[in-house]
Regions:
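N-terminal intrinsically disordered/low-complexity leader segments
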Residues: 1-34, 196-202, 228-240
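Amphipathic, non-transmembrane alpha-helical scaffold segments
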Residues: 32, 40, 82, 86, ...
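Helix-turn-helix
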Residues: 38, 42, 46-80, 84
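Hydrophobic alpha-helical connector segments
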Residues: 84, 98-127, 176-183, 213, ...
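Helical hydrophobic small-molecule/effector-binding pocket
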Residues: 87, 91, 108-133, 152-159, ...
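Short linear capping/connector segments at secondary-structure termini
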Residues: 99-100, 132-140, 200-201, 236-237
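Short secondary-structure transition hinges
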Residues: 126-156, 177-178, 205-206
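Hydrophobic/aromatic-rich alpha-helical bundle segments in the mid-to-C-terminal region
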Residues: 143, 165-217, 227-240
Length: 240
């Protein structure tokens, strides 16, 4: 879910997609930390290659070049190590490395930078995003966690929209929460179609990643009726 309110990250932290009950305390030694990290990295590759249902513990231990005994030192099941994979991966999606945009810059520039960072991180984690969709379809508890996390981002973006409205930089007649839900949902589905199911690969010409950034940014800006940078001193919406 795209985050256009980076400055508000701490106000409503999204819940983890990893079930806390499945996460053990990390090892206390450097060697233990390295071994656990290697297992998690190997598990991610196996899950992405085989899918959650078909992945086996023996596939993970072979990929990590370790024994079953070593695996059970750190994890008790496939569910446990999948939770560890999510714990690591979600940090990349939560903090995708958005380039700095000064607070006084126009809102469109902030939205564009946020969209670019989100889509870049989504592409980097495309295989995992497809895997999450698979798990959500078979695991009600995980689906609920994922929905709660998405809702936190929707609320965060809604606060950002409300701030723009208060500054006269967005259409004041829009309901911030409903608008955020619509635009955030659009972003996640477009990203899933472009990077996971590759729905647009039959189109001519092919949509590039930068095309996607520009298109979704224009949709955000137009939907919110954000004025262009050279008209920031004017209200976003004027009576006719």
């Amino acid at each position: 879910m795209v985050n256009v309110a980076a400055e508000d990250d701490c106000a409503d932290p999204p819940p983890s997609m990893a079930r806390p009950s499945l996460l053990r305390e990390p090892p206390v030694t450097e060697r233990g930390l390295r071994t656990r990290a290697a297992l998690v990295a190997a598990a991610r590759k196996v899950f992405e290659r085989l899918g959650y249902l078909d992945a086996r513990l023996i596939d993970i231990t072979r990929a990590a070049n370790c024994s079953a005994g070593t695996f059970y030192t750190y994890f008790s099941s496939k569910e446990d190590i999948f939770a560890a994979v999510l714990e690591v991966a979600q940090e990349d999606m939560l903090h995708p490395g958005m380039s700095h945009v000064a607070a006084e810059d126009d809102p469109g520039a902030v939205i564009e930078a946020s969209n670019r960072a989100y889509l870049t991180a989504y592409k980097r984690n495309g295989k995992l995003m497809g895997l999450l969709e698979q798990v959500a379809n078979i695991d009600p508890e995980f689906r609920e966690l994922r929905t709660s996390r998405s809702n936190a981002f929707v609320r965060r973006n809604a606060r950002s929209i409300a701030k723009l409205q208060a500054k006269g930089q967005a259409d004041p007649d829009l309901d911030p929460l409903l608008t955020s839900r619509a635009l955030s949902g659009m972003m996640s589905r477009v990203a899933f179609g472009h990077f996971v199911t590759r729905e647009d690969r039959d189109d001519t010409p092919v949509t590039t990643d930068e095309d996607l950034v520009q298109i979704v940014t224009k949709l955000w800006v137009n939907a919110l009726r954000i004025p262009s940078p050279d008209h920031r001193d004017r209200p976003a919406v004027q009576d006719q």
